[in-house]
């Protein structure tokens, strides 16, 4: 009784959505992209194409890609700045990317450092947008959008944050490749400490009000 030894197709999802309750997800944006890739990198895979066609038939934009590492890093570079910094500032995307000082001191350096790590890991970053371009796009997309980043929503709801997935693993790769990441190290330490203190307060009954965190809406950050 199991799934067998079939190798799963890899999928990277770029979508703005909220977990209304366990098992129920609300899509909050008409722009939803699924990037599909075989572990082997075979962009001509019949099953990957069938999956893309099935998703497209359901109204979702789906693309078959040849290098999932490229897609994962592309998405990560969109999350590594505004997501953790939102926990420290309490601000939404529009407010943060519109703040010139914050962009120069934290947001842009985080993206540049992570991009340097990706390059050191063998990822072709030549076609990736620059840090400034990413932030400009984020600013444009955030206009009229009041949804806070997913890490901030998790923080406010008392749920575990994706600290390791978004920051910690990049830091581990940086150490392994010898790439300096001073901004990332500071932000990682601050966010981890904020999460720990927040959890301690909730355990002490100072911050949660007894509400079941699993029932609170959560936006799943999809690279924007």
Role assignments for model-derived ranges:
Residues 49, 96-97, 104-224:
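NAD(P)-dependent Rossmann-like dehydrogenase/reductase catalytic/cofactor-binding core
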């Amino acid at each position: 009784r199991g799934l067998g030894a079939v190798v799963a197709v890899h999928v990277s999802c770029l979508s703005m959505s909220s977990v209304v309750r366990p098992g129920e997800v609300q899509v909050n944006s008409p722009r939803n992209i699924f990037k599909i890739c075989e572990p082997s990198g075979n962009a001509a895979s019949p099953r990957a194409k069938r999956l893309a066609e099935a998703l497209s038939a359901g109204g979702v934009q789906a693309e078959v890609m040849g290098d999932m590492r490229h897609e994962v890093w592309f998405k990560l570079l969109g999350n590594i700045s505004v997501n953790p910094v939102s926990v420290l500032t309490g601000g939404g995307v529009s407010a943060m990317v519109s703040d010139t000082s914050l962009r120069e001191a934290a947001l842009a350096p985080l993206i540049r450092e992570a991009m340097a790590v990706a390059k050191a890991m063998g990822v072709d970053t030549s076609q990736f947008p620059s840090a400034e371009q990413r932030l400009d796009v984020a600013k444009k997309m955030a206009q009229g959008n009041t949804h806070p980043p997913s890490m901030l929503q998790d923080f406010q709801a008392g749920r575990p944050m994706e600290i390791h997935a978004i920051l910690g693993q990049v830091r581990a790769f940086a150490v392994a490749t010898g790439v300096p990441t001073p901004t990332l190290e500071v932000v990682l330490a601050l966010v981890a400490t904020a999460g720990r203190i927040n959890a301690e307060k909730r355990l002490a009954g100072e911050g949660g009000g007894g509400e079941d965190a699993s029932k609170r809406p959560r936006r799943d950050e999809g690279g924007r």
